[in-house]
Amino acid sequence: MKFLCILLLASLAATSLAILNEPEDETHLEAQPTDASAQFIISNLQISTEDLSKEPSISREDLISKEPNVIRSPRQPQNQNPKLPLSILKEKQLRNATLGSEETTEHAPSDASTTEGKLMELGHKIMKNLENTVKEIIKYLKSLFPPASEVVKP
C-alpha cells in the first residue's frame, strides 16, 4: 500500500514538473478523441488559417506593456476598528457567559420578543444541531477505518 502511494506521488510530481517545464506554446491540454464522430465535430469547430489571418494578433509583450505596473490586493482594506452590529455583540457576550457548558441556556423573554433575539435563538439551535451532526459523522467515519491493531500486513 505504501509502495502504491509512493508511486502515485512520484507520478504526480513527475507530471507536474513536466508540465511546468514545458513552454506555454507546447502545453497540450486537449484530450484526443478516438471516436470518428467526435473527431468530425472537433474538425468542424477548428478555425481555419484564413479566419486567423483576419484577426489582429496581440503578442504577449503588447498585453504586458499595456497593463499598469500597480499591484492590487483582491481584498478590500480591512478596517482596524470594525463596527459590529448590536446582535453580534450580544451573541459574543452570551457565548462568553456560557463558555463553560456545552448546553445552550434559555434566553430571557425580553430577548425572544425581538427579532434579533429570535434570530439568536434559531442560530443557537442550528449550531447545536450542526455540532451534533458533525460529531455523528466523525464517529461514523472513525467506525469505517479499522484500528491499527486490526490491520494485517499482506
Swiss-Prot record:
Pfam families: GLYCAM-1 (PF05242)
Region Disordered, annotated ranges: 51-115
Annotated signal sequence range: 1-18
GO cellular component: membrane
Keyword GTP-binding part of the UniProt annotation: no
Superkingdom of the organism of origin: Eukaryota
InterPro entries: GLYCAM-1
Membrane topology qualifier: Peripheral membrane protein
Family: Belongs to the PP3/GlyCAM-1 family.
Protein name: Glycosylation-dependent cell adhesion molecule 1
